[in-house]
C-alpha cells in the first residue's frame, strides 16, 4: 500500500505488478476546493485483471439500514451518482487516468454489515489484537481492522500484530438448532468483523 502520495510517475501505473494505491489526499482536497463532491478522503485503486485495467474503491454510503429495501435502493442511486463524480475526478486529477473510461461497475452495492448472530462464541477485537488461538479453529485471518465509520467520515485502519483464529463456534447460533451461519453475519463484534470480513481468511 502507498499512503499520502502527491505524485507517482505515469510509467509506474503501467507496471504489471499487483498493487493497491491508497493516498492522493492532496488531490482529493484540491478537487473538493474546485467543487467536486467526493465521498472519501483518499483515492483508492488497485490493479485489475487485464493490462491497463484498474479497479476503484471510492464510493461510500453511510448511515443506512441495508435490511430496509427502500433505504438500500436509495443507496444504489447515491452510489451511481458518486461513481460519475469519481470518474470525473480521476480523469482530472490522477496522472495516467486522463483517458480512462468505465468498463463495468459492480452489479450491486457491497454491504459491509447488517445483522450478526449471537453465537456460541463472540469474536472480539481483543481476540484479534492478542492473536487468539482456538482448538476449534476453522479459518485464520490477519487483515487489519478496517473500520468504516457507519455514520460518516472516512475509515480507520488498525494493524494486527499477527494472524488470529476464527473458531467454529462463531458460526453456531446460540438458540437455533441445525443451522450454521457464514459470512458477514457470523458472531463477532463490530470491530472484529471489520477485520474478519475482508477477503480472504484462509
Regions found by a protein language model. Give the residues of each.
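Mobile, glycine/GP-rich and aromatic-enriched active-site lid/loop segments adjacent to catalytic centers
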Residues: 1-181, 186-189
